[in-house]
Amino acid sequence: MSKLDLTKYGILNATEIIHNPSYEFLFEEETKAGLEGFEKGQLTELGAVNVMTGVYTGRSPKDKFFVMDDTTKNTIWWTSDEYKNDNKPVTPEAWKSIKKLAVEQLSGKRLFVVDTFCGANESSRLKIRFIMEVAWQAHFVKNMFIRPTEEELANYGEPDFVVMTASKAKVENYKELGLNSETAVVFNLTEKVQVILNTWYGGEMKKGMFSYMNYLLPLRGMASMHCSANTSMDEKETAIFFGLSGTGKTTLSTDPKRKLIGDDEHGWDKDGIFNFEGGCYAKVINLSRENEPDIYNAIRRNALLENVTVDAAGKIDFGDKSVTENTRVSYPIYHIENIVKPVSKAGHAKKVIFLSADAFGVLPPVSILTPEQTKYYFLSGFTAKLAGTERGITEPTPTFSACFGAAFLSLHPTKYAEELVKKMEMVGATAYLVNTGWNGTGKRISIKDTRGIIDAILDGSIDKAPTKAIPFFDFKVPTALPGVDPNILDPRDTYADAAEWTTKAKDLAERFIKNFVKFTGNDAGKALVAAGPKL
């Protein structure tokens, strides 16, 4: 048994502490006989284990809270009546009760403790310790965070932040504590502790630490970004891909012709781009070996599937969304062949790509943005929310999520826009808005065409292509690109009647204008209105 002392966190009488277990040990633990309910993992034909997470098959943003105290009162971007977000306050008194529930659930149990790093740069990385009673949850964080070397573990010392996952505990008295339900995902930034109660969804542990990095890094003059990143084989040409869940971040950055830095969370400092994570968390609904070979091949022993349909013999049906559209796999980043080694970081990004899945069929498949448009569309963060990444959403609905990640922003959105644009201006980077959604055919733009567009951005051929302007939005769009169907580049050409595009375009332009009002409270925001759509 580990000599680790958990009493300093209030956890008493642990019957056994398994500290930094190996993958082999976790595999035995999560598939052993006698496990019940959501603790149980099932071995699949691909060698990966599948687990189910119950009613929570996505994050639960309504249950996310920060303790409001002297640390956070004037720094957190709190939710308000006029501009709602997920940063809801909870009192220090309520926190005591919430933490007590987690501590009592974990006390007297056999526990897993996993020590990780968040952030690939030694100068800014955090030591995060996860404590849980469920083997597959330990496996999940081992996949998703940076795994310290033996030597780094020997000198690990005290963590910078502690996460207690107590999925079996419920908050019965949630109303009197000012919470939303029996489920709670609560951060205390003074104590540097996160508590997760009554949800089994793995993504809460991953995204919790993203919210914390999003709090710390911009205050230290770094950009903190909800994006994927890759670089050329010689590691000289870096690109970053912003986008909300389901817009193609993982798919498009996982490119056999380039090296992956990471698929979801990155920082940008004076030296370049660095990953926060040590793994990938890919959506696997309708996954096929043909369309996404790298992700498909990453699903093997030590990968962990979530909420995928698997029959008694272990056969996987990736097309079945009866449990959720938000089926996932986590795997250590080295399951992808082309990655930046040994540390997931590279130089400055010259190409910045905003991915938007437009359900209206209005946006061009690619637009070259001016610096002012870059700020405007970054703050707008438009996409159509795609099925199932949050509870209760199954049809595409338009959404504006500041900085392509409002759910994870702990500070005001303009802070992230400032840091990003500062870094872009420093290196002369260009931004492109890429629509991975629908057009006038009623079908989604093909992965083949989107990949052709990304190739043209990365190899620079888009910057030499002839262009035209698109009305209302004043987007500069190429009229021809190698390997891309020329008939889709102007979205009007995909409609049987271009007047239908005009009607839809006016509607979408109006939504952009209305949404942007919330950013016009200061001069910087007011100045950007001119870069947006005009009716």
Curated annotation (Swiss-Prot):
Enzyme Commission designation: 4.1.1.49
Swiss-Prot/TrEMBL keywords: ATP-binding, Cytoplasm, Decarboxylase, Gluconeogenesis, Lyase, Manganese, Metal-binding, Nucleotide-binding
Top-level class of the enzyme under EC nomenclature: lyase
GO BP, sorted A to Z: gluconeogenesis
Cofactor: Mn(2+)
GO cellular component terms given for this protein: cytosol
Pathway the protein contributes to: Carbohydrate biosynthesis; gluconeogenesis
Domain of life: Bacteria
Protein's UniProt name: Phosphoenolpyruvate carboxykinase (ATP)
Organism (species): Porphyromonas gingivalis (strain ATCC BAA-308 / W83)
Gene it is expressed from: pckA
